[in-house]
Amino acid sequence: MQTEEKPFKIGLALGGGAMRGLAHIGAMQVMEEHGIMPDVVAGTSIGAFVGGVYACGMSLKMMERFCYSIYEKDLMDVVRPRQGLIGGARIERMLRTLTGNRTFDQARIPFAAVATELERGERFVFQEGPIWEGVRASISIPGIFVPFHTGGHTYVDGGVVDRVPIAAARELGADFVIGVDVGYRGGESPCDDLFKIILHSMEIMEWQVMQRRVGEGDFVLAPSLLEINPASMAQAETCIRIGREEMQRRLPELQEAIEKKKAELAARQE
């Protein structure tokens, strides 16, 4: 008796890295140009932002244009620093607009946003309710953004526990997961203002956790972004270009890995 062949699903796990995460856009553009379309997407921090907006239907070209038109001041509503430097009201309005107020079950493709539940210190995967809420929770860098409060819980940046959400992509049903790591991976990084100090402290912690998980993805892209200021939109074009170039360079390796995984799964089903 012949069993019905299960569709092969590609998952995309977009990691955190503040503004360096704009490299996700370039990497995804190359994938799309070569017919490698994700069936599911999971994101952490800036990866949740890019992945959430993409899952709601915004084209990568439109996303790129948006990045060139926005400045840090458009995202910042500075508050008295009791829980964070930035209140988050401006970015919440922007997220509602960019996602069209869609809920997770209204997304064009299955999407999950990874955050950290602060009270219990645990990874939390948003898959229900408004997408903007999951993204807002996931991007809440401790000390910079006021934490996101919903359902009686407090959430901060998902990178605290899971910088590149490979496991979340698998939980969405992916057979093959492409991880994109845009965070710090060693080396000297300038820390000459408060934002950079907080961000780099987070990056160091995330890197220590990430090193133990680097082998979880079927393919992990890690563009070199150390020279990019993670607290500024000024290098958006450079960041996107680096993402494109690195994915283009490793494209044959990715294509080969996908075909190999397909063959392995087909052999198991025989």
Q: What are the roles of these predicted feature ranges?
A:
Residues 1-44, 52-270:
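Patatin-like phospholipase
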